[in-house]
């Protein structure tokens, strides 16, 4: 099911009160290489969901001990996936970090921190559906499996899809742990 030569990263970020002035955001990441697993989490005040999604990936990248890795990233963030898979960042850099609408790119600091890792490693990005109930009716889960394969343009085994979904849910739990920890005095 898993390729022991591929470093898999599962990430999630979330924000309670997203876009409000007094919100809390959390992020979670899981790094998996063969049988070795490392879980990371953290939180910030006055942030956004997108920043937490990006922070999860950045902290996962920072935890990698050596360069030249073959990495598969699994995330439910359309923002992250679209940027990397459609190479938005290339257009942004060419346009002086402006969007197609001539506005400054949001979260530029995090994008600039993430981009060097693309040069250092061979990275593939896979979009997953977030917050999946693993006890869903079989037909609903099968539809999610078909959508997952369609989104990613390749076939995964059903068992692999279940495993990836479990890991994505765990990354979400880690993000919530981060939020809970920052709430405590």
Task: Cite the ranges covered by each PLM segment.
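RNase H catalytic domain
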Residues: 14-19, 58-168
